[in-house]
Amino acid sequence: MLEKVYVALIHYPIKGKDGSIISTAVTNLDVHDIARTARTYNLKGYYIVTNLRAQQDMVSKMLKFWREGFGSRYNPSRAESLKLVKLKSYLEDVLEDIESVEGERPLIFFTSAKKRENDISFEEGRRIIIETEKPVLILLGTGWGLPDEILEISDYVLEPIRAQSDFNHLSVRAAAAIIIDRLIGENYARRD
């Protein structure tokens, strides 16, 4: 059901270069660009997940400027896309928020640049999203990817965007746009 698709950009817990669990920094571009993609594809919400108070404060100030301040008058379409953004400390908070809105836990789609056992194709993911009545949450990682603890609670693992490439290091903004397009594409426009 395309009306219940959400995306979350995870900054904690994230794998560090050495495999340890870290928090990554939120970037202005990730907030803006993924929000614009989410709005373009009519997603129901976009979550920024960071456990760092300073990062939360920075994102909150930025959102206030673009939603309510001068930015909302200067660039109304940006303000519209940023209305989709919710800031949460942990993935559990995101799941609780979606469950409070939708009445049930979402199906979780795990994404990775790495090929994993039992991953599903984008075509299969698209079919699941269209056919399910449940809400869907697409998880995007930062740093060196989402950790196993998130993999373990996920319902599906999507195939990598370019599994066979000798260079597979897209920005999360580019990956988000490609993943969302492959899963939703023009299906949303054609449902009427």
From Swiss-Prot:
Coiled coil: none
Pfam family, one: Methyltrn_RNA_4
Family of this protein: To A.aeolicus AQ_054.
Name of the molecule in the record: Uncharacterized protein TM_1570
Organism in which the protein naturally occurs: Thermotoga maritima (strain ATCC 43589 / DSM 3109 / JCM 10099 / NBRC 100826 / MSB8)
